[in-house]
């Protein structure tokens, strides 16, 4: 327990209060920053249950998001043509068609499409810290492999990804550097992929019993 709470606290979602400690990204103290400011500093949260935004096309939403981030970094706004080229290339990596970009944000999307749309946003924003909150939940094997491909494409030495999951199966396609087990809101155990495999076989009881 506490995994999604941790993700939401780092991202600065309303409804949570930090009573002790600090949240830092590099040299930046995030505690008192608004969610939008944290996002501009490179924090990205892929929601467990992405919401619909009727009347706003995916392309409009994504370009506005990217433009906002570039403005905060004093970078020139991308032309519509240049952005469309980048968006279509990123969508293709996730097996999404150009027509997908014209649809309303998450409007009528399947569960798998919503999750892939979150990964699409991550690829375009290129955050320093991406938190994926149960992105694998409810996905069939094909969608899971596609999402994993997008995560692997994004991962490099200049960023960090926190994957929140209950299951080991995502790690069949993504090689983690560390596996942390949270119990009652605290990290109870840390290991590598072998730890995830052990949890899949033996459950969590042996951790709470020690």
Which residues does each predicted region cover?
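Helix-to-loop junction immediately C-terminal to a conserved catalytic motif
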Residues: 11
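ABC ATPase NBD Q-loop/coupling interface
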Residues: 22-38, 106
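ABC-family P-loop ATPase nucleotide-binding domains
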Residues: 41, 51-128
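Walker B motif beta-strand of ABC-family P-loop ATPases
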Residues: 128-134
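Walker B catalytic motif
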Residues: 134-135, 142
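Helical segment within the ABC ATPase nucleotide-binding domain
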Residues: 144-157
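Conserved H-loop
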Residues: 158-166
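Conserved beta-strand-loop-alpha-helix hinge in the C-terminal portion
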Residues: 173, 182, 186-209
């Amino acid at each position: 327990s506490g995994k999604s709470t941790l993700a939401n606290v780092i991202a600065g979602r309303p409804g949570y209060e930090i009573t002790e400690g600090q949240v830092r990204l590099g040299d930046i103290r995030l505690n008192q920053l608004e969610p939008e400011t944290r996002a501009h500093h490179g924090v990205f949260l892929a929601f467990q249950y992405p919401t619909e935004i009727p009347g706003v096309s995916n392309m409009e939403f994504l370009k506005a998001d990217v433009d906002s981030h570039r403005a905060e970094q004093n970078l020139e706004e991308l032309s519509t043509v240049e952005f469309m080229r980048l968006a279509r290339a990123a969508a293709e990596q996730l097996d999404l068609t150009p027509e997908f970009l014209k649809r309303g944000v998450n409007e009528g999307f399947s569960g798998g499409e919503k999750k892939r749309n979150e990964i699409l946003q991550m690829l375009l924003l290129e955050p320093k810290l991406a938190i994926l909150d149960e992105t694998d939940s409810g996905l069939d094997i094909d969608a899971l492999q596609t999402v994993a491909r997008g995560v692997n494409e994004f991962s490099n030495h200049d960023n960090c990804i926190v994957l929140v999951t209950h299951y080991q199966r995502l790690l069949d396609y993504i090689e983690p550097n560390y596996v942390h087990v949270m119990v009652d809101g605290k990290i109870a155990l840390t290991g590598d992929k072998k730890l995830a495999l052990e949890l899949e076989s033996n459950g969590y009881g042996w951790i709470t019993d020690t």
